[in-house]
Each structure stands twice: as structure tokens, then as C-alpha cells.
Amino acid sequence: MSTKRLFSLILAVAMLAAIVAGCTNQNGAPISSPPAEETAAPVQSEQPTQSEEPQQVSATGKGTLTFARTESIATLNPHMYTSDIESCCIEYTGAALYGYFYNDDKSGVSLRACIADGEPIKMNDNGTVWQIKISPDARWANGEAITADDFMYSFKMLLDPKLVNGRGGAFAEDYIKILNAKAYYTQTEAEGAVPTWEDVGIKKVDDMTIEITTSIAQDATEVMSHLAYAWTVPVYEEMYESLMNSDRTATTYGTDIDKVVCSGAFTYNAWERDAEISFKKNPEYIKQDMIQIEKLVMKIIPDRGTQLQMFEAGELDYVELNSSQFKDYEEDPRVLYSPSIYVKYMPVNVNNPDNPILSDVNFRKALFLAVDRESIAKLHPRPR
């Protein structure tokens, strides 16, 4: 288990506030689960004075936020990403049906509609059929409307048994279990027959409405949470198809910034592999009035010590510290506690053929009874 907690030194709090809620999930992170609980982190001692009158937000934004990450980026395809940094890039540039946004007083975040036009509508008494309407204001970065067809195509490709997209299994079953989705994705029998796409519980009702049928009863929050993940961000059909190979087993969608169409808060500006990726504000984003910053610059710096040196030299606007580095900054007036990644729970892969003992429930109980809970609890940083 990783016991490392992340702490942040933040010099540009006002700029960061506009985007931090967009990447509080965790899929290695991310990014698209609910935001992590508060951990420690640092800020400039004086924050900008807030005007009593609301300020007009520019369609292009103002200012640049420069920060660093340790990982490299392999793909920008929401169906195939594997790392936290890839999830964050997709969440910066893609809009899902639902997402986590600041509440009115910015004291926390809440799960709200993004591209969706309101909460899911329960269509039967037992909570297995849900309709989601798409906002008429939802747009791709190229100005085209986002419709039900975009989500139908995206979800079909995500579950496509020939593409075998890495995120298809989680989309089939996570917060909710979509009817026949897993059996279609894995091409295994469901009630005696391998289902076709038409058997999967995802249907188009009209141009701006989709309907999802689940195999068990679900509630609205579960449906919204499931449809807030980064892998549910829509892909642009025309480009996705144009980049498909001849036997339809792979697409190069998302392998470069000119091979993806954005729908989120930012669009891709430039990408120098293993060095830097930058983003610029998307004026077509449905919630663009919430985004105050013009540009993000994410540098790839594997060594955290180097990141800290760059921060102190003024080359980065904030830096994340591991627990050992934090000891030197614990009393620094710039320290601020902010939402960050943390260990929620440890799942056990009960289906791993290389470790069949993990399928034994009594072994798993013994495993967790052996965990030293007191030592783990002591690792939590003291409250400030």
C-alpha cells in the first residue's frame, strides 16, 4: 500500500481554483471518482483581494498556470488511458454528462450536470431505467452541437469487443451495472446467448436524450457518478472513424493533439512528448464562465527534487511534495491543505489465475485482519 500523501505549495491560488475541481478523481488518481478528502498543501501568504461585485469572465481567460507532473503521457484517448496524468488531460479537455464542480461558496465540490441537462430521470419504479437529457448548449470545441448520437457512438466504441478498449470493462460495471454491457464487451454468454450491441442497455430516445437500463436497481447519484468518469467523455465520430485500422481492431484517436476533438474546459495547445503539454481555454465549453485562466502548462519532471528547485526558482507556480519533503515546509506560511489523491481502499483481484488463493473469502478476511490499522492511522498528517 502506498502511504504517501501529497502536499502542495501553491502560489497562484486564484488561478488554480478555476481548475482544481476538474481533476480530483482518481483512476490512479482520479480524476473521474468523487474528489479526495482534504490533505495538506501551501499558498502565498496574501491572497488577491476579492471585488464585491462579480467580474465578467473573459471567453479566452487570463494568465498562465505552470506546474509539473512526474509521469509521461502515452494517450489522450478517453477509452484507453491508464495513468493519472492521462486522466487529468482528458478531464481538462473533455466534458462528461456529469462532473464535480465547486459549490456556490467554493467551500467544496458537488456532483452536478455538465453536458447533461439536469439529473437522470427515473423511468420505472425499481430504478433500472434512466433517461439523461443532453443540454442544447453543449458544444464541441469546433462549435458543433453535442447530441445523443455522439454519446451512442462513444459508448458503442468504448464497449466494442474488437477494439477491446481498456476502459470498457469499468464502463460496463462500476457505480452501475449496464444491462448486458459486460457480456457484450467480453463476448461471453448472458442468459444463454452472447449479446449484440442491440441487447446492451444503452438506447437513443431522441436527438438529445439517451436511456440507460441497468441489471440491478440503482439511484440517481450512482448513475451520475458513473457518467462523470473520464472514460465517458465523448469521442468525435468522424475523426475516430478516420483513424480506425482496416479490421477495426484499433484507432489512433488521441495519439496526438491533432487526433482528438475537445469538448471540455480547455483544448490542447502543444505537446512535446516527455517534456511538456499545454492547454488553452475553450470558449465553446458549456461552463466556460467558471474558467478564469487562459492557459495551462504541464511540465513532465520525473524527479520531485528538481520540481521543488524549479518552484523555488519561480519556474513553477505550485509544486506537490511527498511526505519527506513536507517536513522542511511544515511551518511554511505558504502551506495550504487542498483536495488531493489518497488511498481510499485496497481492492483484491479475486479473479487472478496466478493467485487463486485470493478467491478464498477466509484468506481475504485473514489478510485484512493482519493490517496494522493503528500504524496506518498515525500516518495521517496532523490537522492544521
Question: Which role fits each region the language model picked out?
Answer:
Residues T3-L6, A18, G22, T128, ...:
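Extracytoplasmic/periplasmic ligand-capture domains
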Residues L11, M15-I19:
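Hydrophobic core
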Residues C23-S33:
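Bacterial lipoprotein signal-peptidase II cleavage site
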Residues A40-L65:
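N-terminal low-complexity, Pro/Thr/Ser-rich intrinsically disordered segments
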Residues A68-D125, V261-C262:
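N-terminal lobe/hinge region of extracytoplasmic solute-binding protein
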Residues R69-E91, I115-A116, G166, T221-P234, ...:
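A structural "hinge/loop" feature
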Residues Y102-N103, W197-E198, I216-Q218, S225-I291, ...:
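Gly/Pro-rich hinge or "lid" segments in bacterial periplasmic/extracellular proteins
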Residues G166-S242:
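Surface-exposed binding/hinge segments that line
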